[in-house]
């Protein structure tokens, strides 16, 4: 048997509850400026004697509210529509159309609707929950006693005429003919002008009421982006849309997206605290929608409030409906589960506030069709019109129930932004189908699955790393016009230098009698008979020209001509011809060495040419080349070449037999410097 509570326990419980409510209100007053405060509105409860059977309501336009955002963030005005107020309808492309009569009525039926919502929905209490969520980064954790499961009259979404009536409310966009109405300033200065500047900035609400003022419908209409209605747009439209419906304020995607915050820290990584702070600024649509709703409840404190909207206005009405527990009917609304989770809206026990799409009994119904990329959450590809317009519409999940017309399968429509307009939806979808579709929840839907989000308190440290790289590149003294696999195949030129040389005609020859694996084990030095020492200071010019006409894989396979001209007394060069090259390297036949003839000034040398008819597979020459020794003309100088013959070449390199050396005999007259 449950234990009864004593009076003392009840008194303590009442005292703690009062302190909690006052603390939330104090927190809200400290965060929100005094200009935004309105009188405390009692919680909305079902009307007494609400009938269980559907009831017909006859609605008519009573007020037009306007809440400024960017250009006039403090502006809030109300126009009371009277019988003598003349209104004009404004089409979605911004052009004024025909006059309408303010007494025109719209019919809709109601049916019982169950909503799980907060028991205390007064504005200061709600603002306290939102402020606490913004401060801590998490939705307020509330006890089950703070929630109620209420059954109240709501729109009959199974009735086609009722759905059409709500769609017509969202399509009606009225302006007042100058001089026929009186705008009441709720907050801020209203600078009246015939051009109605408020059309271009802020959130506009059309207020419909039935004849008893027992049921009121708020139809929110945001500033329509030019991407949707063809009119001129502003940067503020993209900023607001990308802030609410993008994973990170238009960052991390296409370069065409308009960035509305700077919260991305790395690729697919963002600071969630930074995003939430940007979303809850006073000049954002969500704050404007709450202010507009609070003023309506001030006029109709005892009425049941229903909400409706199209596109961006539909998303804002859904967020307000989740906040205050109101019936909502939207059309082609932008998926709003992502901003609902980030705003920290309270969730009933048993539901994760990070996934508001999993909640039941929300009272929200979203009508749309499959050919609308905005409603389906697919207007974000690189080729989509949304992207080219600068909009980052990345959210894909709706809260509540989704009622979808499959126009792609039923009518063969292609997905396109032209099907998003509410007038097209009414004439081509809602009126053509015989019945309304069934409504289901999107519980298994997830937003921004590729992203990682972290929370911070604003004290994180950003570290910047600078890397310095030093690159050293070699300097070439020649230009290659025909490069090969492992070298240059075209002609090369060596620069001409002028030096002062001292030449001594002493030749030294070293013969290895016993070669080893890594050198010579028995070196023998033979010194030739020197000629008289000649010391000359002359310019030295060296020029080498190489031409390759038939390059191979690892070398040149055609004739190579070398022209050497030396004007000095250098050491004698040696040329060797190989008839039987080794398998890998070295020479296996008897080489022939020729010593060049040294000359004095007025020396002329003919070019030496070598021709290879059978080049090796990888490198070297396998045939017997033809060598031509230059004939020189010197005054009484005779030079005998030194030849060396190897009979037993080494396995890998070197010569294993005793070579034969012939000393050079030089005869020359006394040179003259």
From Swiss-Prot:
Single Gene Ontology MF annotation: triacylglycerol lipase activity
GO BP terms, alphabetized: antibiotic biosynthetic process; monocarboxylic acid biosynthetic process; multivesicular body membrane disassembly; neutral lipid catabolic process; phosphatidylserine catabolic process; piecemeal microautophagy of the nucleus
Record flagged with keyword Ribosomal protein: no
Carbohydrate attachment residues: 156, 191, 213, 271, 295, 457
Location in or out of the cell: Endosome, Multivesicular body membrane; Prevacuolar compartment membrane
TM region positions: 8-28
Any one cellular-component term (Gene Ontology): vacuolar lumen
Lumenal domain ranges by topology: 29-673
Keyword Phosphoprotein in record: no
Catalysed reactions listed for this entry: a triacylglycerol + H2O = a diacylglycerol + a fatty acid + H(+)
Keyword list, A-Z: Autophagy, Endosome, Glycoprotein, Hydrolase, Lipid degradation, Lipid metabolism, Membrane, Signal-anchor, Transmembrane, Transmembrane helix
Catalytic residues, chain numbering: 311
Membrane topology note: Single-pass type II membrane protein
Topology feature Cytoplasmic, residues: 1-7
Top-level taxonomic group: Eukaryota
Record-listed E.C. numbers: 3.1.1.3
Oligomeric form and interacting partners: Binds to both phosphatidylinositol (PI) and phosphatidylinositol 3,5-bisphosphate (PIP2).
Family per similarity comment: Belongs to the AB hydrolase superfamily. Lipase family.
Function: Lipase which is essential for lysis of subvacuolar cytoplasm to vacuole targeted bodies and intravacuolar autophagic bodies. Involved in the lysis of intravacuolar multivesicular body (MVB) vesicles. The intravacuolar membrane disintegration by atg15 is critical to life span extension.
Protein name: Putative lipase atg15
Organism: Penicillium rubens (strain ATCC 28089 / DSM 1075 / NRRL 1951 / Wisconsin 54-1255)
